[in-house]
């Protein structure tokens, strides 16, 4: 879990979103360390890239997905993705809107796959994170299983020339 927040990284306040994501991942059966809190911008990309290199199953980030000039998380994360999963980010935005939060439409959150790692960027508000957790609860375990070769027999087999 990567938390993108200039203020939390500087100690102005304690982040409350990262622990929500860690708790959800642990509830879903993932061994998850405490959140990494970094300033907005390039440190977010570096933290996500480190997690991808470590070959973790899932990276969830919170913060930096809006339209504030310092919100750069999607710009840092998107180049790291091998494949985009636009439906995941769209589902999170749609859920927020359906819950009566029209500003959820302003989120630039992205989701995708880097190697065998699922990456999803979430808003920095506790409400946005809770919405994300609701949407991701069934998706994350299934996606991780698929990325590990499950659900499709033979998907781990090397390609053979035809």
Residue positions per predicted region:
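Non-catalytic beta/alpha edge segments that cap or flank active sites
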Residues: 2-162
């Amino acid at each position: 879990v990567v938390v993108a927040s200039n203020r939390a990284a500087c100690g102005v306040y304690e982040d409350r979103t990262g622990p929500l994501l860690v708790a959800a991942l642990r509830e879903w059966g993932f061994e998850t360390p405490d959140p990494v809190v970094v300033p907005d911008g390039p440190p977010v990309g570096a933290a996500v890239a480190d997690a991808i290199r470590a070959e973790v199953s899932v990276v969830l980030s919170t913060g930096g997905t809006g339209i504030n000039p310092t919100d750069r998380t999607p710009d840092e994360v998107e180049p790291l993705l091998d494949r985009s999963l636009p439906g995941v980010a769209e589902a999170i935005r749609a859920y927020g809107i359906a819950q009566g939060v029209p500003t959820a439409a302003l989120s630039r959150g992205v989701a995708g796959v880097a190697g065998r790692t699922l990456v999803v960027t979430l808003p920095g508000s506790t409400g946005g994170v809770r919405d994300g957790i609701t949407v991701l609860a069934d998706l994350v375990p299934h996606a991780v299983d698929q990325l590990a070769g499950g659900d499709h027999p033979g998907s781990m087999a090397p390609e053979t020339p035809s």
